[in-house]
Amino acid sequence: MPYHVTRFRGEQRKSKPRNNQTLQKPNGAISPRVRKVGGERFAIICVDPAKHRSDWMMADYFGNLLIGPQTLQHRGASFKLAVELIRQAQQKHDIQDTIVVVERTGNYHLPPKRAFASAGFETRVIHPFATKQYRVPADPGNKTDETDLYAQHRAAVAGFGLCELELEPPYRELQLRARHRRNLVEKAAAMACQIREHLHLGMPGYANLFDRLFESPTALVIAARCDSPAKLIELGQAGLSQYLHEDQIRHQIRTIDKVLAWAAQAVSDPILDGPMHHAIWTDLHELYQHFHRQTAALERELAGDLVQTPYVRLLAIPGINVVSAAELAAEMGPIAQYANANAITGRSGLYPSRHQSDQTDHNSGPIIRQANRRLRCVLMRIADNLACHCNYYRGQADVDESRGVDKRAARVKIAKRFSRLVLACVAGDEPMRHPCFQKPDSILEKLRRFHHEHQTPTDLLLADLEVAVGQLPYNTCNHEAEIVADVLQQHTHRRRGAGPIGDVLPAVLARLNIRATEANKNGDRS
């Protein structure tokens, strides 16, 4: 078996004593630095951004104003002037340590954040919720830019100015492409509903003739040719068949007969503005096809980014495809940022809310609302896929269903279990013996099929497969080499020969054999 792990049940983890506890958030604590230089020598620069300008001020740790609130235009010259004022204030008041705190406001906070960071200042981000909580008690009913700046200072002193880790390549590109693809998919899904609606208004009941309307090669082509049932009957079987032949669309006569049978029944239905609805849905369908082509191109690029990360190992799990693994890698970022699996579910908010006061304790409420929703959506989509396509998680879902567990709660349980598996699979190189890996999928074969479906050029396919080999654990190389050799042999024995794949797989197989040999020399288990 290619995946296995040795468990030591007798060993118990020794919990380290947590003597140095702090009430501040770990990535927002500034107390040690303030203690080192003194509160009068520690400055906090607060920035309240808008679209074209920001308000900012500078004060020491104790709240003494060093630079009063003023407006900063989002221009290079204005940023340089603000930096110069800060430098002068640092010299005048003997400031030895400084941080810049910028309130998160959509994307409007990015220009001042990057400008101060490029000037050499440590730049942190504060959430608007924290600003509000520190503004309302001090200035109830009075929300201005100035009161917001004062509240930001109080929140930063309390440790809510948080350091954010910048994503490095390829995670930055992967995140932008994955979010762009998801946006296109959502827009295409909404557009598909509009197409169905206008198609139904122009040709009632036509869409019900096909199980998969948009995947059928003939359904929308025939509907685009005729804007009414009467015109379908006028063309007849011979006319429709000739039209499809001219467009080089493969079809069956029984499909045309089914359409004509529907047209004979619908020809007497009262249809209002049929030609207008036909023109609308055909225009929408052209845009839908453009979205579909762009999505396919982005997916090819996502695969190229995914193979540069260890998240490609997740393809060995049945139910995980290239797009799912790429979206997870995009939203999680480098796995080294997570100390344990609870950090993953904590960031995604996959844990119940709690309300406790005195002897009242409601500790099993709904999952929390304030969380990283993008990461949560990715994990829940993967949980749906695992419940359908992975035997292990499908069995757990069936058990929960038999017990009457809510389907949403069952999916959350699967997502939490999967997060532990992600950490073990991506962060470490140890062999895995999770039930998911009893019959693992081939990572390279999944990638090859994905690129075959997306019609990726051979040179890009070879490059992605070779990069993916470098991400594989040593213990999986022999297993992958066997599958690659088997696929190559099957294609070689075909009448048409190996084709383009015969130029790709030998190089990949050689790379796998080299890694397997290195593993044996190093004494790794396979």
For the regions a protein language model found, what residue spans apply to each?
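A detector of single, family-specific signature residues
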Residues: 2-526
